[in-house]
């Protein structure tokens, strides 16, 4: 088979919060399935099975991974001729744009054992606290980086940088 499987990270954790490519992928897709509900539904395994199914039918597959959880697939994009995106859309929350046309929401809330969930309220709150600490630390780190960048640029010898770049190009490719 000539079809390919490609692996990407679908989001990045930055000082400004989570940045992701999912809106762009939704715009590229002909059909979008947004899977919404509490975490823990083994969605990654479902995403993998969906990819395997369509790969066996000859489609190219793109898997998009969560940067926080090792080997956790957040989205599976089945390329032509299907152009179908399956996306875990709870965190980050992604809402349908063309509900009922291109976008279809699959609610997993009916699968939740509310007693089990409520028994773990403290753990859920702890997770949220660490999540907020993580992004506060990233925001602080980007502020420090930006401050250093301002100071560094004040003392930069831009002409010297240009000269070094020109020397590198000459060394690699010879004279023009």
Task: Map each language-model feature to its residues.
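Accessory recognition modules or surfaces
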Residues: 13-29, 75-83
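Short beta-strand-centered segment that lines the nucleotide-binding/catalytic pocket of NTP-utilizing
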Residues: 36, 56-71
């Amino acid at each position: 088979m000539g079809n390919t499987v490609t692996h990407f990270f679908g989001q990045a954790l930055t000082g400004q919060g989570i940045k992701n490519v999912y809106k762009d992928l939704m715009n590229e897709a002909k059909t979008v399935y947004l899977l919404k509900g509490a975490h823990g539904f083994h969605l990654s395994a479902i995403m993998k099975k969906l990819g395997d199914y369509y790969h066996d039918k000859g489609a190219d597959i793109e898997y998009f991974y969560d940067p926080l959880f090792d080997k956790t697939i957040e989205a599976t994009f089945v390329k032509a001729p299907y152009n179908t995106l399956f996306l875990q859309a709870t965190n980050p929350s992604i809402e349908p744009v063309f509900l009922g046309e291109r976008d279809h929401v699959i609610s997993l809330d009916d699968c939740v054992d509310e007693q089990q969930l409520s028994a773990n309220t403290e753990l859920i709150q702890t997770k949220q606290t660490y999540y907020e600490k993580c992004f506060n630390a990233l925001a602080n780190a980007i502020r420090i980086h930006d401050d250093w960048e301002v100071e560094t640029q004040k003392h930069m010898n831009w002409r010297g940088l240009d000269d070094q770049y020109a020397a590198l190009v000459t060394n690699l490719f010879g004279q023009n």
